């Protein structure tokens, strides 16, 4: 038994680290770049970089080659409801992070992107979204759903926000706002920071509702957006 250190914020020698979107192998004591994780679309954010570093370290310990490991990481399709890239419609990308049922989980989504349109809300946990206040500057606009809407509106204060109530209204409002900024790329991210039980049986049902609403928008806008629309596919 032996321990391989990993890190997402500093070089560890010997060890494996993912810093600034680059995966480094420092198992020999010298850090060698092995993969550009920024090109792995299913692995946004530093937390996914850390996951990739852990997977790489485990596979190297089992004797797999660097080439095989990196190929598997770069081709990884991601997990449903966990910062899942759902679709791109015109200039707007949609991400489903319905598994984020508390502020700590949504923190990873806010860290992963520079700017986003945030669909948030549901059955709030005790600390609500207070732990996310340092990252409110990343929010272009918040679209509030579920029982926590009024409470979160007060938390957001001067951050642009809209109480939408349900998923359909939130997805539609976020898309219309984002589409108006064409051709600049916009991100719409469902990362509720809440339990789902006020409106859904579980977080999977909530995420599936988001996916279905995005599919509906894709169908409705295909003719208007023409070549700018990427057809919807469920990942």
Residue ranges with predicted function:
Residues 193-219:
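Glycine/aspartate-rich loop-and-adjacent alpha/beta segment that forms the canonical ThDP
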Residues 36-139:
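Nucleotide phosphate-binding/pyrophosphate-handling subdomain across enzymes
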Residues 83, 118, 142, 152, ...:
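Hydrophobic, well-ordered secondary-structure elements that form the walls
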Residues 9, 122-125, 148, 189, ...:
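Short glycine-rich anion-binding loops that position phosphate/pyrophosphate groups of nucleotides
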Residues 1-40, 75, 79-82, 86:
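Extended acidic/charged loop-beta regions that coordinate divalent cations
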């Amino acid at each position: 038994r032996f321990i391989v250190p990993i890190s997402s914020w500093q070089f560890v020698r010997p060890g494996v680290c993912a810093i600034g979107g680059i995966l480094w192998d420092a198992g020999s004591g010298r850090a060698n770049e092995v993969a550009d994780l920024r090109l792995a679309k299913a692995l946004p954010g530093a937390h996914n970089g850390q996951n990739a570093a852990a997977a790489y370290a485990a596979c190297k310990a089992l004797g797999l080659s660097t080439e095989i490991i990196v190929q598997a990481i770069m081709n990884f399709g991601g997990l449903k409801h966990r910062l899942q890239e759902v679709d791109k419609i015109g200039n707007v990308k949609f991400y489903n992070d319905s598994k984020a049922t508390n502020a700590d989980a949504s923190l990873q989504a806010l860290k992963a992107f520079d700017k986003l349109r945030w669909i948030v809300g549901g059955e709030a946990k005790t600390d609500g979204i207070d732990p996310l206040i340092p990252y409110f500057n990343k929010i272009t606009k918040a679209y509030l759903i579920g029982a926590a809407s009024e409470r979160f509106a007060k938390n957001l204060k001067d951050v642009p926000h809209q109480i939408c109530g349900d998923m359909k209204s939130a997805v539609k409002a976020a898309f219309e706002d984002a589409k108006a900024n064409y051709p600049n790329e916009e991100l719409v991210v469902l990362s509720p920071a809440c339990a789902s039980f006020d409106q859904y049986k579980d977080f999977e049902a909530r995420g599936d509702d988001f996916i279905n609403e995005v599919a509906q928008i894709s169908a409705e806008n295909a003719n208007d957006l023409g070549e700018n629309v990427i057809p919807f596919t469920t990942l």
